[in-house]
Regions:
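Hydrophobic face of amphipathic alpha-helices that form TPR/SEL1-like repeat modules
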Residues: 1-5, 19, 32-41, 68-77, ...
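Short coil/turn and helix-start
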Residues: 5-11, 25, 43-47, 61, ...
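Short, low-complexity interaction segments enriched in Ser/Thr/Pro/Gly
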Residues: 12, 27, 91, 101-103, ...
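Residue-level recognition of tetratricopeptide repeat
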Residues: 28, 64-66, 100, 136-138, ...
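Ankyrin-repeat and related helical/solenoid repeat scaffolds used for protein-protein interactions
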Residues: 148, 158, 165, 170-198
């Protein structure tokens, strides 16, 4: 962990992978998840998507919530396995109900876009809102968009602005872009031209 994030030592992915690997044979969920993540992204080791997927599966079977969400992403993008939106939805749903913030957002996105299910804007908004409560910037931005265009919730420009501002002030670049565009499209707000240029 310390080598992964460079806490009190120089950041060293190879050393971090080596140390995490010590717990893999013991079946430690955190070790399985961390080495899977390194293998997926090629951190300190040659990228191996298939092996990453297998380790995520093992960690998920042991109840590791982030691994359950990661399996959803593997199925969503076809990384280390075939692309399968319905399987992705299954894992996102499982992880979301266990409190995983990213899975809550992903579940909202799937309902929003109709991936592996029928489009359901109300459910999409619900899950965006749940992820936003956890402080996830992308979910806060998605909520703002729902309010701006009336997707799954009654249209409310003031609330859209409030949520765009919240996410933008957290440093989320997509929210900053959306906020600039929002001001450009809504000239009724004070100093909208100036604010549009700023964001």
């Amino acid at each position: 962990y310390f080598y992964e994030y460079g806490i009190d030592v120089d950041q060293d992915y190879e050393k971090a992978f080596e140390l995490y690997s010590l717990g893999v044979d013991e079946g430690f969920p955190r070790s399985l998840f961390s080495t899977a993540y390194f293998l997926q992204n090629g951190y300190g080791v040659i990228q191996d998507l298939e092996e990453a997927f297998l380790r995520y599966e093992e960690a998920a079977a042991l109840g590791h919530n982030d691994a359950i969400c990661a399996l959803g992403e593997c199925y969503e993008y076809g990384q280390g396995t075939r692309q399968d939106y319905q399987r992705a939805l299954h894992y996102y749903e499982k992880a979301a109900y266990e409190g995983n913030s990213l899975a809550k957002y992903k579940l909202g996105r799937f309902y929003d876009l109709g991936y592996g299910c029928n489009e359901n804007y109300q459910k999409a908004f619900h899950w965006y809102q749940e992820a936003a409560k956890d402080g996830l910037e992308v979910a806060i931005t998605a909520m703002a968009t729902c309010y701006e265009f009336g997707r799954g919730i009654e249209k409310d420009s003031q609330k859209a602005l409030e949520y765009y501002l919240k996410a933008a002030n957290m440093g989320y670049m997509n929210a900053q872009f959306c906020l600039g565009y929002f001001y450009e499209m809504h000239s009724e707000y004070p100093e909208s031209e100036k604010n549009s240029f700023y964001w």
